[in-house]
Amino acid sequence: MDMQSRIRRLFQASIDTKQQAMDILAPHIEQASLVMVNALLSDGKMLACGNGGSAGDAQHFSSELLNRFERERPSLPAIALTTDSSTLTSIANDYSYNEVFSKQIRALGQPGDVLLAISTSGNSANVIQAIQAAHDREMIVVALTGRDGGGMASLLLPEDVEIRVPSTVTARIQEVHLLAIHCLCDLIDSQLFGSEE
């Protein structure tokens, strides 16, 4: 297969996964946006975490809220728990890498805040511990997962929301996670500041 054919095949695989996910995920993304907007209207904040590409997604989400998405508007409170290398490495060194997010949540999280927990497999131990810490702090969890939801899915409470991408391919799951994050940002803005359509 030549390279351009391979590129077209990858584009098509991404399109197919998004089309398959669209109707499945729409109600879950809507529910997650309602949870987030309710928290923001109640003076809550968003915390976000994940590893690797999911850490990048957590930072992307946080930056879109803190700065802006596609319109001028006031900044919204969001913290990516993946960015402070001194905090991450001190917790990993003194305790365990599995606690790098949970210790931050126990310090920063308040009842009514929302944790956006991101893992393509749903099995990242430090994200699982983050969910447990969020529940201890009476926070609501929005989980971005894939595959079968992994250990994260089994921890979620009735008020939590899982956005589980119907795929087993990590790259496709990540692509849909980014789209879901953009949908959340759009829905948050439209609910708080009115639709621009």
From Swiss-Prot:
InterPro entries in the cross-refs: GmhA/DiaA, Phosphoheptose_Isoase, SIS_dom, SIS_dom_sf, SIS_GmhA/DiaA_subfam
Residues binding Zn(2+), per UniProt: H60, E64, Q174, H182
Function noted in UniProt: Catalyzes the isomerization of sedoheptulose 7-phosphate in D-glycero-D-manno-heptose 7-phosphate.
Location of the SIS domain: 36-197
Family the entry assigns: Belongs to the SIS family. GmhA subfamily.
Lineage: Bacteria, Pseudomonadati, Pseudomonadota, Gammaproteobacteria, Pseudomonadales
Note from the entry: The reaction produces a racemic mixture of D-glycero-alpha-D-manno-heptose 7-phosphate and D-glycero-beta-D-manno-heptose 7-phosphate.
Organism: Pseudomonas entomophila (strain L48)
Transmembrane segments: none
Cofactor binding annotation: Binds 1 zinc ion per subunit.
CDD domains: SIS_GmhA
Protein name: Phosphoheptose isomerase
Keyword Magnesium: no
GO molecular-function terms, A-Z: carbohydrate derivative binding; D-sedoheptulose 7-phosphate isomerase activity; zinc ion binding
Stored Pfam families: SIS_2
Location of the protein in the cell: Cytoplasm
Enzyme class: isomerase
Disulphide-bonded residues: none
Cofactor(s) this protein requires: Zn(2+)
